[in-house]
Amino acid sequence: MRLGIHTFTSGSLETAALTAGDLGAATFQIFSASPRMWRARVPDPVQIKLLCAARERFSLSPLVIHTNYLVNLASLDPVIRAKSIDAFRGELQRAIAIGAEYLVVHPGSYRGHTVEEGIAAFALGLRDASAGLPPHQLTVLLENTAGAGCHLGGKFEELRSIRDLTAELTDLPIGYCLDTCHLLAAGFDIVTAPGLRATLRAAEAVLGLANVHVFHANDSRFPRGSHVDRHAHIGEGFIGADAFRRILTHPKLRRKPFILETPVDEPGDDRRNLDILKSLAGSKLPLPAR
């Protein structure tokens, strides 16, 4: 199992990798540019080389990039849609240039339209954004959401429909990223042992766990079914340490990368959360039933 954390570039790709390595992470996630700006510069080739060297030094793999917060490929608003397609193409190009293994994207909001229209809009947007890309090893990961309002991704079936339709329109590899906080907020029981078994059975049946390449490890400030996406420190939210122990030690998940996106309220919070995650993953308690 590879455990890691979201780190920030602070103007330097190398900084993000060095931070992850210094924290003792085995994998990490970054934004390839500002998460709140439509346009971004192409990464500096020198910085890419330094990033690769830092990754090799600390054996950091995989590298996951999270798409910026503005991209909404499910939108049918012509202005937002055009900006989203252009911005996501930039995300793809930067991820390929940097050498990332995965690019995580939220399915987006279909406000004013139907779920089916939103799914179709996302798939078509991904097709347009990825047209003509050079050969690469990048896989795009659809992240589950808290399922609030008109946001896609709160149900496994929606993620599956997006992937299936996208596969008909493009050769771009598509998988999934599951966020523990989002799962709980969307109504999945991942807290109890029977609930976790049921959730994983559903994920296997609908998504195929082999297609779930990354997990985001976040506790939740709100209870199950709240549809509110607010991350908490590991063990301090409504998921709790015991549930994370079951998740991290489950036989079907032990080879998955888990990446923290927990709050930083005080200096040292990143290290503390990562150390807690490592401790829970290394627990000697009996493994749950398959």
From Swiss-Prot:
Listed EC numbers: 3.1.21.2
Name of the gene: nfo
HAMAP family from the UniProt entry: Nfo (MF_00152)
PROSITE patterns the record matches: AP_NUCLEASE_F2_3, AP_NUCLEASE_F2_4
UniProt-listed GO biological process terms: base-excision repair
EC top class, as a word: hydrolase
Family designation: Belongs to the AP endonuclease 2 family.
InterPro entries on file: AP_endonuc_2, AP_endonuc_F2_Zn_BS, Xyl_isomerase-like_sf, Xyl_isomerase-like_TIM-brl
Highest taxon above the source species: Bacteria
Positions that bind Zn(2+) 1: 66, 106, 143
Keyword set, alphabetical order: DNA damage, DNA repair, Endonuclease, Hydrolase, Metal-binding, Nuclease, Zinc
Residue positions binding Zn(2+) 3: 182, 229, 231
Gene3D superfamilies attached to this UniProt entry: Divalent-metal-dependent TIM barrel enzymes
UniProt GO molecular function: deoxyribonuclease IV (phage-T4-induced) activity; DNA binding; DNA-(apurinic or apyrimidinic site) endonuclease activity; phosphoric diester hydrolase activity; zinc ion binding
Pfam family, any one: AP_endonuc_2
Function: Endonuclease IV plays a role in DNA repair. It cleaves phosphodiester bonds at apurinic or apyrimidinic (AP) sites, generating a 3'-hydroxyl group and a 5'-terminal sugar phosphate.
Cofactor: Zn(2+)
Coiled coil: none
Cofactor-binding details, from the entry: Binds 3 Zn(2+) ions.
Catalytic reaction list: Endonucleolytic cleavage to 5'-phosphooligonucleotide end-products
This protein's name: Probable endonuclease 4
SMART domains: AP2Ec (SM00518)
Binding site for Zn(2+) 2: 143, 179, 216, 261
